[in-house]
């Protein structure tokens, strides 16, 4: 599987959905023709390299299945400082929580612990070298009528 580790901010299991940003700067002396990276998250991610959106996912799954996406990062790289970043939303819960429609969209079954996993090149592998920031002003509001649709999202930009 590579040397990337599942990473998340903090140590505890959250009881509310969370939106967390991850970022790492990497210095590249040259750009390879191809650089395959594998990525997954609990529950959803958007991968950015040098400010360009590279991928979003993972493919939705339920139960014990966890999909990992593979992307070619080479077209997004340049020599010098390269910034790799990911936005990750974690919908908390387990099968019982999902059955009550209080874990997020019913097509995305989550676990109690959020996470990001990236691997394929040691410079990019997720580890303690990533900075992370939980977005405190981002809230998930429960749906009032049709809970199976998931949450409404609210951003406080102040």
Segments predicted by a language model, with ranges:
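Boundary/junction segments of secreted and surface-exposed precursor proteins
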Residues: 1-11
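Accessory beta-strand-rich segments of carbohydrate-active enzymes
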Residues: 11-13, 17, 22-157
